[in-house]
Amino acid sequence: MATLSFRNLKKTYAGNVPVIHGIDMEIKDGEFIVIVGPSGCGKSTLMRMVAGLETVTSGEILIDDKPVNDLEPAERDIAMVFQNYALYPHMSVFENMAYGLKIRKVPKAEIQKRVEEAAQILELGKLLDRRPRQLSGGQRQRVAMGRAIVREPKVFLFDEPLSNLDAKLRVAMRLEILKLHRRLHTTSLYVTHDQVEAMTLAHRMVVMYQGVPEQIGTPMEVFEKPASTFVAGFIGSPPMNLIEVDVAGDGTMTAEGMPLQISPLQVPSAVRGRKIIMGLRPEHMLLNAEGIPVEIEMIETLGSEQLVHGRRGKHMLVVRCTTRQLSESTVKVGDTMNIGPDGRHDLHWFEPDTGRRVQGL
């Protein structure tokens, strides 16, 4: 196990194209960090820099406080699990898992011991003689994980390892990775675009946007207090409703010139008398409540719950409600009705010019 540190880490491609804009971060021994963000945000580039597959333009990467910028990938004592399993088709499961150790000239008895231990952890013991073509997608990914485990690295790197799996297998493999980390306690860096993976796996998550960490925190810290409108719109499914409002000195609000029936008691003094962006989580809103008049444009049926989409001028707002609540309200597409906060959860407030969360709220 090891610590992993980034010190003002930057990456610029040819033509002076910046990709990573200066990351400072300390990852504790045994911590599971998930880097999440949209395509092109720099998360995979950051992972490849740690692995030694991309050069560092400036700054430092340290493992156990030792700079590794100039070390070859094989010298960094890391193991990487990729999106595509990268298994040798002509080798058995045992041979695939053992190959890296053979290259490093580890004694045969030690190889046998490590492979059998990893196979037991990953429930691959009965599959060691099979070829990759005889395995399911989930089994192949477990073999790729086993190949990383037998190296006994200081740091595990996971580069979107579940992206090629179907939805059911992804859930199963998330549980496998959780159990694996609880057993091994190896420092891990995990890259994904899937916020569900980030929320369920991470001790802390790093939300990346345009090469910069927008927010670093525990999953619940990020969900409950997003640092910016980007984070609010990226974390959460469906994402947070964001609406531009004018707040009077007495706490009353208007949006696009129309009054909003939201109690001034829910409006803090820091946002009164100014323009602001107000955020409301779909699951923290109610139909037929005091708040925002909208025209219902769409209703999504998801079994036990429904997503009701209503338009207010240029804003599309979503309410998540149970199927029973929706049937009791008799709402249908084309209706005009009020939606509003449930009163039990805080509203969110963001600066209109920067998108950052209002300080102290």
UniProtKB/Swiss-Prot annotation:
GO terms for molecular function: ABC-type glycerol-3-phosphate transporter activity; ATP binding; ATP hydrolysis activity. PANTHER family: MALTODEXTRIN IMPORT ATP-BINDING PROTEIN MSMX, SN-GLYCEROL-3-PHOSPHATE IMPORT ATP-BINDING PROTEIN UGPC. Signal peptide: none annotated. Part of the ABC transporter complex UgpBAEC involved in sn-glycerol-3-phosphate (G3P) import. Responsible for energy coupling to the transport system. It comes from Bordetella avium (strain 197N). It is a peripheral membrane protein. Pfam families: ABC_tran, OB_MalK. Its EC number is 7.6.2.10. Residues 4-235 form the ABC transporter domain. ATP binds at residues 37-44. GO terms for biological process: carbohydrate transport; glycerophosphodiester transmembrane transport. GO terms for cellular component: ATP-binding cassette (ABC) transporter complex, substrate-binding subunit-containing. Keywords: ATP-binding, Cell inner membrane, Cell membrane, Membrane, Nucleotide-binding, Sugar transport, Translocase, Transport. Belongs to the ABC transporter superfamily. sn-glycerol-3-phosphate importer (TC 3.A.1.1.3) family. This is sn-glycerol-3-phosphate import ATP-binding protein UgpC. The complex is composed of two ATP-binding proteins (UgpC), two transmembrane proteins (UgpA and UgpE) and a solute-binding protein (UgpB). It catalyses: sn-glycerol 3-phosphate(out) + ATP + H2O = sn-glycerol 3-phosphate(in) + ADP + phosphate + H(+).
